[in-house]
Amino acid sequence: MKSYIFLDRICFFAHHGVGEQETLAGNEFTVSLRLQVNIAPAMQTDDVADTVSYADVYEAVKAEMEVPSKLLEHVGGRIVKRLFGDFPQIENIELKLSK
């Protein structure tokens, strides 16, 4: 059974941007995720090991947001790549990264 896990409007302070002021001073960013996963195993077992842990996803996104980048497209690409790599249960990702 496929379903979605949502992490909505997670706020981070980070140093992304093309301009010198953006990279020095930093800015607030918001990340929202919609992760498509098969929830059938977790429905049966009630075990977090059979699904995607919200806490682990948050930590992965936080780690990528801490790496300064010029372009939000680059940050978003890293987040998606990291999540697919760390969580093979994820079948699809929709990401919104806002400044």
Positions of predicted regions on the chain:
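N-terminal, polar/charged subdomain of small-to-medium soluble alpha/beta proteins
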Residues: M1-K99
